[in-house]
Amino acid sequence: MPLAYALIMTDNFGDDPEFDVQTLRVIKAIADEGSITAAATSLGYSQPAVSQQIKRLEKRLGVAVIERVGRSVRLTEAGRVLARHAPAVTTALDAAAGELAELRGLRAGRVRLVGFPSASPTVVPRLLTDLAEHHPGITITYVEAEPPEAVEAVREDRADIALTFSYPGDRDDPHGSSASGLAVRAVGADDLLAVLPEGHPAGGRERVRVADLADENWIAGCPRCRGHLLELCGRAGFEPKIGFETDNFVAVEGLVAQGIGVATLPRMAVESFPVMPGVITRPLPHAEARTLHLVTAHGAERVPAVRIALDALTRVLA
């Protein structure tokens, strides 16, 4: 951070009401990691330095913020209050730092991105290329996670941006109540493809309807993808005969190539590796496409590095 911050608390907590925002980061890290040692490691500090910060904070507040339970520690009610407000406070201060840095002509920063697996070999390389060309000072760190976990990572301030998806009629949509209080924006669509063995009768059509595959054996994906397949086939008037389940895209194509069954995969997943010999793909109707989303904390776009990354993601997903 190019600037140092102090958060002034106006409530009557002890004789010295001032504590720095880094202490909030320490409290949040303890909540996430479950120990002072692990929190110190995650923040790049020594364990004694973190312990001293906690002691100074407790002296200023006049209440304990952690308590020991066996060999671990947990937050007290006061500590949980601080941890709950920490993400909003740090996001606002990061935004202020970014705006001030912009005034000084700086265009650098680190953005923590989390995205689903099929985005890793498709979207992420294009994003990095875009940023290297237009904003070489922006650094991206990246972790894979499916949408529910990715949304939670933003909520817990472990990520700045989550790249997620949802399906039409998705009853487990992570952008519903679980994203309450977060900013969710739709940025594109990812067509769903029928994955068929070479020579399949439906392969001669420009688009395939799910109802055309009602009599086939099916290969399903992860539990959430399986749920979507059941809904998709249910809307087409049949229950799929699922003989195999795997979330390994290569395995799906291998099974299809051997005539074991048919499957559906998002276009992004299919484009993440060469289509296997003996396999053909045909698009399903556009109405079955999954929607791609960017999820952030409210106000995160005021942080210049985050805004630049959001704009770049929007471009590469267009």
Q: Would you name each region that the model predicts?
A:
Residues 123, 279-318:
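A late-sequence structural motif
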Residues 146-151, 155-159, 165, 224-280:
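Hydrophobic hinge/microswitch elements
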Residues 173, 177-185, 190, 250-298:
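Beta-alpha-beta core module
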Residues 28-45:
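Short helix-boundary/capping micro-motifs
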Residues 58-77:
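A short LG(V/I)-centered, amphipathic sequence patch enriched
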Residues 109-172, 246:
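Central regulatory/effector-binding core of bacterial HTH transcription factors
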Residues 165, 196, 202, 206, ...:
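Secondary-structure junction motif
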Residues 176-218:
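Flexible hinge/capping segments at coil-to-helix
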